[in-house]
Amino acid sequence: MAGSVLMGVGDKTADAWREHVGGALAKMKIDDTSANDGAEMGPVIDGAAQSRITQTIASATATGAEVAYNGAGRVPSRGFFVGPTLLDRVAPTMSLFQDEIFGPVLSMVRPKTLDEAIATMNTLGYGNGATLFSASGAAARQFTREIQCGMLGINIGVPAPMALFSFSGWNQSFFGDLHVQGIEGVMFYTRQRVVLSRWDKSYVRAQGW
């Protein structure tokens, strides 16, 4: 998603995720995706976006975030590239956590409990999609009931539904009166009409109609 946050509940879980994700980023192929079919990640949209993203990373590290993986040295020299970056121990007060970055940056926050994780996520002004990876049905039920978000996944990487269901962001991730896709998407193009009728023999004309 545009603002990507990874929460490992408990240090043991967070450490495992840090190692796994950092290893995956180190293998990622970065290049011009229009010229190289093997490239997995291309540049950002323009120089302004490149500058904004790198400044956000610098601000977070200057205020306490740890660089778990820095891919800046692996990007092509030409183009508006930003290397894939994993930042650990990000504080919920940082702009990296609060704002949508729209760049290849993953933030890690380390809540001690699921309750703390949900409470922290619910401080965000956005509410597009969130996923819980867990073997616990109780944790999944709590997550789906308490998280303030429109699209939820349980053990699913990206909780974006098919067109049969609404793309249902909440809070600042929702603009307008109706969501796109699903029945709400159909209703956007629908003009409703209500007809009230009553029939009995007193309305029958002599001609029979």
Model-derived regions, located:
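Short secondary-structure junctions
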Residues: 30, 62-73
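Conserved C-terminal structural/oligomerization subdomain of aldehyde/semialdehyde dehydrogenase
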Residues: 9-12, 29, 33, 73-74, ...
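Helical element adjacent to the flavin cofactor pocket in flavoenzyme catalytic cores
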Residues: 56-61
